[in-house]
């Protein structure tokens, strides 16, 4: 039986060079087939979905018009880059997206020449593009540089810093604003398309440039008035561009990002411009072409595997509550008792559990957009006035507000409460989203209480502890995903500051855990017992202030002391070692070891596989104990067998 391909034209395209050989009338078919291939691929792998479907026509048009990879194409964030990957020689691997050894879910320089700049965090594309444009100019090059940025990413200050700089430099940079929420201005029919084409065309630009040159020879008052008349006339006919024009960009748009008859001529005109910078305002729809995603953009922003026919996602029934939900529910309970408790998120309400708080206390919830710097100092201002702000931000994104943590929070000892979600390794999103560094970058700061929850019940108590801390900032870190299924307390009870807890008493080996590796410590202790080694287990709870009494007790009563954490070098283990060194406890026979994440950026995989590769699972802990004893782990396992 003969089978026919659903994507016959796309099948002929291995690189954008093949795409550019096609007739313009064929580009529509390529886009339709590219959308189908994107849907089919993501249904198998899961991943970011809605944004990619929204830029299928734009992606096709850019690669058709511009000479990529010679022309540099930078995607902000990278959520929308799956169609780009399919067109740029990676279609044969597209069903390995976000799996171990497979394609990254974001653009990645080491993956393809068509990815000139890696991305995953928001609002970096214009800065990177400007750097590349200036490098081109200094080198005497002629290639184009295109940065594609979404309207959501435009809420971050970095994007405007870059635009301000680009406008002042008059650099020939092309910025395409992918407005998929129509938050700036919608395209209004044929007139909008006509004007966009007119204003991007050579005739209009030549007349405009000639008028500018003439204006230089006119009296200043007349020249300024003429300039304002021109700006007013464009602004009157083309709503939405005033801000960008003020920043020094030549604004074109808004145009329908799904209409290739509008996109292609405008992009060709922009490509041929000899001056810059230029901003092309393109309006798109998230989830375009897949009805379930069009109807529910938020639910299809990121998906697990799903059935293409129905849109039903294959979500497994949870065995325990997710940490983010435990945080949100705990915060609600605390806020019911204390009207000073407020919640803050930086464009991640559902990811952090702040959405749960928002349903109960909408007026006490603040989503500040992709603006972590602002979020931290905004929280500091609330704290200065006696409120109890909880700033819920992923570990990897909190890095973006570090100076504000130091300068605006810690130096002033303001009681901002940081809820650090996605601490440790996060799996499919890989190195760009791993919460590896907060133990290290917060641990060096004075005036900070630092906690890590070993399970979901501990998180409830730590939220209550943060509410009670009113004289300094505090943080609690917890991972992505489900808890352990432990018995949950009805209400949180504030913990004694700087005090850990003993979980199991042993004799020879002490395992001191900070965070959710505690479960692996318990498995390791059971395995060590099978080898005749008695192990104590302690849950540190606090990195700062450190439970010095507990640390000294473990060091004095055991031959081996091992710290375990889900963080980089310079974190919890370093604090324990420094304290023991200062106490002279490392001068004698104690065998002290620190288990941390490897000093590298780990590629994406499942969290379990990543932790195993890092040696931070039960097997890795047992291996570390045998190494400290000078024994061969493999040989010991064989003996037991």
Curated annotation (Swiss-Prot):
GO molecular function terms noted in the UniProt entry: 1-deoxy-D-xylulose-5-phosphate synthase activity; magnesium ion binding; thiamine pyrophosphate binding
Protein name, UniProt field: 1-deoxy-D-xylulose-5-phosphate synthase
HAMAP family: DXP_synth
Subunit structure: Homodimer.
Pathways involved: Metabolic intermediate biosynthesis; 1-deoxy-D-xylulose 5-phosphate biosynthesis; 1-deoxy-D-xylulose 5-phosphate from D-glyceraldehyde 3-phosphate and pyruvate: step 1/1
Cross-referenced NCBIfam families: dxs (TIGR00204), PRK05444.2-2 (NF003933)
Cofactor binding comment, as recorded: Binds 1 Mg(2+) ion per subunit.
Binding site for thiamine diphosphate: 79, 120-122, 152-153, 180, 290, 372
Reaction(s) catalysed by this chain's protein: D-glyceraldehyde 3-phosphate + pyruvate + H(+) = 1-deoxy-D-xylulose 5-phosphate + CO2
InterPro entries in UniProt: Dxylulose-5-P_synthase (IPR005477), THDP-binding (IPR029061), Transketo_C/PFOR_II (IPR009014), Transketolase-like_Pyr-bd (IPR005475), Transketolase_BS (IPR020826), Transketolase_C (IPR033248), Transketolase_CS (IPR049557)
Binding residues annotated for Mg(2+), in chain numbering: 151, 180
EC number(s) reported in the record: 2.2.1.7
């Amino acid at each position: 039986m003969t089978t026919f391909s659903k994507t016959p034209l796309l099948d002929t395209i291995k690189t954008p060079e093949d795409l550019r050989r096609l007739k313009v009338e064929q580009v529509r078919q390529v886009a339709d087939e590219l959308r189908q291939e994107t849907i089919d691929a993501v249904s198998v792998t899961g991943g970011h979905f809605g944004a990619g479907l929204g830029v299928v026509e734009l992606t096709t048009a850019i690669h058709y018009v511009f000479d990529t990879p010679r022309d540099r194409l930078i995607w902000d964030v990278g959520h929308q880059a799956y169609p780009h990957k399919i067109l740029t020689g990676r279609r044969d691997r597209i069903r390995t997206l976000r799996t171990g050894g497979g394609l990254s879910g974001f653009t990645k320089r080491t993956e393809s020449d068509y990815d000139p700049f890696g991305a995953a965090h928001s609002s970096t594309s214009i800065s990177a593009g400007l750097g590349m444009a200036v490098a081109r100019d200094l080198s005497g090059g002629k290639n184009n540089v295109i940065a594609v940025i979404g309207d959501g990413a435009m809420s971050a200050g970095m994007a405007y810093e870059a635009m301000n700089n680009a406008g002042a430099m008059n650099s020939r940079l092309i910025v395409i604003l992918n407005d998929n929420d129509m938050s700036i201005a919608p395209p209004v029919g044929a007139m909008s398309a006509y004007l966009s084409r007119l204003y991007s065309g050579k005739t209009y630009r030549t007349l405009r440039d000639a008028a500018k040159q003439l204006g230089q020879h006119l009296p200043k008052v007349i020249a300024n008035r003429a300039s304002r008349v021109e700006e007013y006339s464009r602004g009157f006919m083309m709503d939405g561009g005033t801000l960008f024009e003020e920043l020094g960009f030549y604004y074109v748009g808004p145009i329908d990002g799904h209409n290739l008859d509008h996109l292609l001529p405008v992009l060709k005109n922009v490509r041929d411009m000899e001056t810059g910078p230029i901003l092309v305002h393109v309006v798109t729809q998230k989830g375009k072409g897949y009805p379930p995603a069009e109807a529910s953009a938020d639910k299809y922003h990121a998906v697990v595997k799903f059935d293409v026919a129905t849109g039903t996602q294959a979500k497994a029934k949870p065995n325990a509550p997710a940490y983010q939900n435990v945080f949100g529910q705990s915060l609600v309970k605390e806020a019911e008792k204390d009207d000073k408790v407020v919640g803050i998120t930086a464009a991640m309400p559902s990811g952090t559990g702040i959405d749960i708080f928002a349903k109960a206390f909408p007026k006490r919830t603040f989503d500040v957009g992709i603006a972590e710097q602002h979020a931290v100092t905004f929280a500091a201002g609330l704290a200065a006035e006696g409120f109890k702000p909880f700033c819920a931000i992923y570990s990897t994104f909190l890095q973006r507000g570090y100076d504000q943590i130091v300068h605006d929070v810690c130096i002033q000892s303001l009681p901002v409460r940081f809820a650090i979600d996605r601490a440790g390794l996060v799996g499919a999103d890989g190195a760009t989203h791993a919460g590896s560094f907060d133990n290290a970058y917060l641990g060096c700061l004075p005036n900070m209480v630092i906690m890590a929850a070993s399970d979901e019940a501990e998180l409830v108590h730590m939220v209550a502890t943060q509410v009670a801390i009113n004289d300094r900032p505090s943080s609690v870190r917890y991972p992505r995903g489900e808890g352990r299924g432990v018995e949950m307390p009805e209400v949180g009870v504030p913990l004694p500051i700087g005090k850990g807890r003993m979980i199991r008493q042993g004799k020879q080996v002490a395992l001191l855990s900070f965070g959710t590796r505690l479960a692996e410590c318990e498995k390791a202790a059971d395995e060590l017992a099978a080898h005749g080694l008695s192990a104590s287990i302690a849950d540190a709870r606090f990195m700062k202030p450190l439970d010095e009494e507990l640390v000294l007790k473990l060091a004095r009563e055991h031959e081996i002391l091992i710290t375990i954490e889900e963080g980089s070098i310079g974190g919890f283990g370093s604090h324990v070692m420094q304290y023991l060194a200062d106490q002279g406890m490392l001068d004698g026979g104690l065998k002290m070891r620190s288990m941390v994440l490897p000093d590298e950026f780990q590629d994406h995989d499942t969290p379990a596989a990543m932790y195993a590769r890092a040696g931070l699972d039960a097997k890795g802990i047992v291996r570390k104990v045998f190494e400290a004893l000078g024994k061969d782990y493999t040989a010991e396992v064989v003996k037991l067998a």
